[in-house]
């Protein structure tokens, strides 16, 4: 059978793209081809088609205008890390923390799976830009998919459509991203609301800068511009070209005097990343302003001024719904007022959405994420724990005025976070770039609130699932960046989750984290006092702004900042990962670890800020 025509619009000039689409049509055998233009009319048409097919449920126009609910197949609710592959030419370049298959072998497997995989479906061609259009840091990709769900989500999450193709001239490079739900339809066969396949592959070819995803419909596996391109492929590109692609939020911090800084922060799962990106300062800290640039990914390069400059490559927010509320993140809730797609949350009788912790008291009746009746106390969640929202970033009430600036934003500080009930203080500053890189490389979180130290999960730079090459080479690349940037960002480590012996959190968190952020900005500009500790530079009690938090005594602060000699156990917990990476581990890491261990051994058994220093100035 002859392949159908690709029907490329006149404004498509890129020869490589035209040839790739022709080859993909011949392989996948779709019934038709649609070149996505990114228009409102196209989005509305696809949403209406999915409502008619049962994939989407239109929410109340009064409660949630122009928004939709989608329920996935129960087997397709999250990223599939065990089916995610880095197919570098050499196995050792993927490293021991990634799954690897030889490229030739993987391509043979994928070729069989993709043969005829789009029969009975429409093939959509989605041109998109990861970053503001025209930015020298932005990168263009093209995703081919047979899922209208992917198209509508990509329109929210990326700058996509005709405007991107008009930037892609005849010889311009782009990253090809191929996706299929893996569920071809025979003539007359009825479709299902959420087509997918049990055989899943999420594959990256770093040398070719190419991505292939098969059989999943879940956003994290199908919105290929996000983790697949902007982190796994982009991190590999960044290593080769001398820049950084990181799993980090970006926020703006403006002082009452009008001094503006930009900060990037890496938070592992369940550490409050989106909440921090949209933090609201306490009312007593009048004049301080926080703006959001992005909540998940940043790309940056060195500027002529010797600093790192960054962009948010995304156009929307793809966030976890449960736990998001007017208490925890009012700015996020305001962002979700309209024009959103919700996946696997619960449906209220009046046509709105609900998820756990959204309100203090759950509704009396819901339809849960699997379409079943739900009432309080029925012993199952109303929303899936990994249920998601996709929302336009432009709707965020504190979006930074320069968030789409193609000239990029200078970064003053990096923050790396963990979730630890003990050992790690509230905040400290690394003494130098190399030490900061080591601390970021060994950052960890407890798997549960009651987990023992042995259950700590080490997640370097919050990049363990997303680094597209050997993690040891990744550490070396970070050290190299520090050697080439004349004015690098200052590096800080935070832990909002330190507890008392009875299990209560010592730090209030949420908006009060602004007090720590203010101290950091003072350190960046050489104004805030600090004390040298076994781990780095720490704030004195009087260095933080305590207005509105009068009950937080210096004694309580001392406990929050203390360092036990048991901290050496934290260093021992790093061994498993570092031994895995030993053949490419930076030599500096061995020396830094020994120096830290020696410092902890020689420190008092229980190190605390000395009270007599509280009033001293550095």
UniProtKB/Swiss-Prot annotation:
InterPro entries: PEP_carboxykin_GTP_CS, PEP_carboxykinase_C, PEP_carboxykinase_GTP, PEP_carboxykinase_GTP_C, PEP_carboxykinase_GTP_N, PEP_carboxykinase_N. Catalyzes the conversion of oxaloacetate (OAA) to phosphoenolpyruvate (PEP), the rate-limiting step in the metabolic pathway that produces glucose from lactate and other precursors derived from the citric acid cycle. GO terms for molecular function: GTP binding; manganese ion binding; phosphoenolpyruvate carboxykinase (GTP) activity. GO terms for biological process: cellular response to glucose stimulus; gluconeogenesis; glycerol biosynthetic process from pyruvate; oxaloacetate metabolic process; propionate catabolic process; response to lipid; response to starvation. One of its GO terms (cellular component) is cytosol. Its EC number is 4.1.1.32. It comes from Chlorobium limicola. Transmembrane segments: none annotated. This is Phosphoenolpyruvate carboxykinase [GTP]. It is found in: Cytoplasm. Disulfide bonds: none annotated. It catalyses: oxaloacetate + GTP = phosphoenolpyruvate + GDP + CO2. The gene is pckG.
């Amino acid at each position: 059978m002859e392949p159908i025509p690709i029907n490329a619009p006149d404004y498509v000039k890129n020869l490589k793209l035209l040839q790739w689409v022709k080859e993909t049509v011949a392989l996948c055998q779709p019934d038709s081809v649609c070149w996505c233009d990114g228009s409102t009319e196209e989005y509305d048409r696809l949403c209406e088609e999915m409502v008619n097919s049962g994939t989407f449920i239109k929410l109340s126009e009064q409660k949630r205008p122009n928004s939709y609910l989608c329920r996935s197949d129960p087997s397709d609710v999250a990223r599939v890390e065990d089916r995610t592959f880095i197919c570098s030419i050499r196995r050792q370049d993927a490293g021991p923390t990634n799954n690897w298959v030889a490229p030739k072998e993987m391509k043979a497997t994928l070729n069989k799976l993709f043969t005829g995989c789009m029969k009975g479906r429409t093939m959509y061609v989605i041109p998109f830009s990861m970053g503001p259009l025209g930015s020298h840091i932005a990168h263009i990709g093209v995703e081919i998919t047979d899922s209208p769900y992917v198209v509508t989500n990509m329109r929210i999450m990326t700058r996509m459509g005709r405007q991107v193709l008009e930037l892609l001239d005849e010889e311009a490079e782009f990253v090809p991203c191929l996706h299929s739900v893996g569920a071809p339809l025979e003539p007359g066969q009825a479709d299902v609301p959420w087509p997918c396949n049990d055989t899943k592959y999420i594959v990256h070819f770093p040398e070719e800068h190419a991505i292939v995803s098969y059989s999943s419909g879940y956003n994290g596996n199908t919105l290929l511009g996000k983790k697949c391109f902007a982190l796994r492929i982009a991190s590999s590109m960044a290593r080769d070209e001398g820049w950084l692609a990181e799993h980090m939020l970006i926020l703006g911090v403006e002082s009452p005097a009008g001094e503006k800084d930009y900060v990037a922060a890496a938070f592992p799962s369940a550490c409050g990343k989106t909440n921090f990106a949209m933090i609201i300062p306490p009312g007593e800290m009048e004049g301080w302003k926080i703006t959001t640039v992005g909540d998940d990914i940043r790309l940056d390069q060195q500027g002529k001024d010797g600093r790192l400059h960054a962009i948010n490559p995304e156009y929307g927010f793809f966030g976890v719904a449960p736990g998001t509320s007017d208490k925890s993140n009012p700015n996020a809730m305001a962002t979700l007022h309209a024009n959103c797609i919700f996946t696997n949350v619960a449906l209220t009788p009046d046509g709105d959405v609900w998820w756990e912790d959204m309100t203090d008291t759950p509704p009396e009746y819901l339809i849960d994420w699997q379409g079943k009746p739900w009432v309080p106390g029925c012993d199952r969640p109303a929303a899936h724990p990994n249920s998601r929202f996709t929302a336009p970033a432009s709707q965020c009430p504190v979006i930074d005025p320069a968030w789409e600036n193609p000239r990029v934003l200078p970064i003053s500080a990096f923050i790396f976070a963990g979730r630890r009930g003990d050992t790690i203080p509230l905040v400290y500053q690394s003494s130098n770039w190399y030490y900061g890189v080591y601390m970021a490389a060994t950052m960890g979180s407890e798997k549960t609130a009651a987990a023992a130290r042995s259950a700590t999960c080490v997640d370097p730079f919050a990049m363990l699932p997303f680094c597209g090459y050997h993690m040891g080479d990744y550490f070396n690349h970070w050290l190299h960046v520090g050697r080439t940037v004349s004015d690098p960002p200052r590096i800080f480590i935070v832990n909002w989750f330190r507890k008392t012996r009875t299990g209560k959190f010592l730090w209030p968190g949420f908006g009060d984290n602004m007090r720590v952020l203010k101290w950091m900005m003072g350190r960046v500009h050489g104004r805030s006092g600090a004390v040298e500790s076994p781990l780095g530079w720490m704030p004195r009690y009087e260095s933080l702004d305590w207005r509105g938090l009068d009950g937080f005594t210096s004694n309580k602060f001392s406990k929050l900042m203390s360092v036990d000699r048991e901290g050496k156990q934290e260093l021992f917990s790093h061994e498993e990962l570092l031994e895995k990476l030993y053949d490419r581990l930076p030599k500096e890491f061995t020396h830094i670890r020994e120096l830290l261990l020696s410092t902890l051994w020689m420190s008092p058994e229980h190190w605390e800020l000395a009270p007599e220093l509280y009033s001293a100035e550095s």
